[in-house]
Amino acid sequence: MTTRILTGITPTGTPHLGNYAGAIRPAILASRRSDVDSFYFLADYHALIKCDDPARIQRSRLEIAATWLAGGLDVERATFYRQSDIPEIPELTWLLTCVSAKGLLNRAHAYKAAVDRNVEAGEDPDAGVTMGLYSYPVLMAADILMFNAHKIPVGRDQVQHVEMARDIGQRFNHLFGNGREFFVLPEAVIEENVATLPGLDGRKMSKSYDNTIPLFSPSRQLKDAIARIVTDSRAPGEPKDPDSSHLFLLYSAFASAEQVAAFRQELLEGLAWGEAKQRLFQLLDNELGEARERYQALIAKPDDIEDILLAGAAKARRIATPFIAELREAVGLRSLREPLKSAESGKKKAAKAARLVSFRDDDGSFRFRLLDAAGEQLLLSRAFADGKAAGAVSKRLLAGETADLRAEGNAFGLWLDGEAVAQSPAFADAAARDAAIERTREALAPQE
């Protein structure tokens, strides 16, 4: 079976070593597998949320596209495109927006972080929050669901967005599928073994921290950047600790196992930091030299890159165009020449719309949510160590097994076999809590 994998990179700056080692290089390697169908795109609509400098976005799109190509991406095997060249994506975004619960989007980490910063500063909670930031998860859901990707390689900070895409896709399927599952529910793949590289100051390499090492900078600039890497004060001849060295982590991300072992031993034997930085420079200059030449040649011919991206968009639209037509048909955006269909024939009753949604939390544990017909959360399960345990509880609830709902202040808990397995959010008052308990009982009642 072929697995479809989808990855996007937001073009808001010059690609750096962290982008390459953490996302681009592993994606290119994965695209060469015969059992993988790869979709890689420049998330330039997402870039507009973070950047209001048109020249920077234009330049970054060119640089990131050239980086993928210089890194060895085979555009005959993979589908490589710009998000903004697929008009079906914003259309799908709107269709999904219309079934996305506000309560779901309120829980998005980026939005909550912005609100928390504003509250801490004594400002209006939504000060500076754009609808682009707020609805970012819906656009990401459209990116994923448009091509029915099975697996989405992400960092831990993006797992929630993939889970939200699952929720939104499941909601659309329920409302408009009429027996058909339009959307595959994607799975977040946390790449535990993919490098998260430190920057010049030891923090995660990020444009936000201004601590990056540009991927394809000329040799002189690369050497100067490496010279600025922060190290401890241990003198030449004094043993160094490789495992606490940012420089060693950078070296390890690009060296062979034999080179890493030799470098580790040299540090333990007291290799001077200046010499260690020279070793890192030589390694990177050798490893990236040929790709740097390809990159510079590509940058000099933007028309060629444009042609490649447009060809990739045409390839992607061969999937997107007929699919969006099916989705338009499903929601009722049909030709007036077609016979009218009754609302009951294409839609399930709202009373049956409550659902259990399983997901993997940021800490790696497994949970499930009970959502009502409007997508509002009624219950959040406790953390389970493995998916089978969480699934077993979900299965019992779906089978209509009687659960004990216990009021706890303005919230309530769900108990099975004398054990608390899920908890509600806090409600405004006891009346709201009791109404939610009744909705929960109805949601968990066996459907005839």
From Swiss-Prot:
It is an enzyme of class 6 (ligase). It comes from the Bacteria. The keyword Nucleotide-binding applies. Pfam families: tRNA-synt_1b. Gene3D superfamilies: HUPs (3.40.50.620), Tyrosyl-Transfer RNA Synthetase (1.10.240.10). One of its GO terms (cellular component) is cytosol. NCBIfam families: PRK12284.1, trpS. This is Tryptophan--tRNA ligase. It comes from Pseudomonas aeruginosa (strain ATCC 15692 / DSM 22644 / CIP 104116 / JCM 14847 / LMG 12228 / 1C / PRS 101 / PAO1). The gene is trpS.
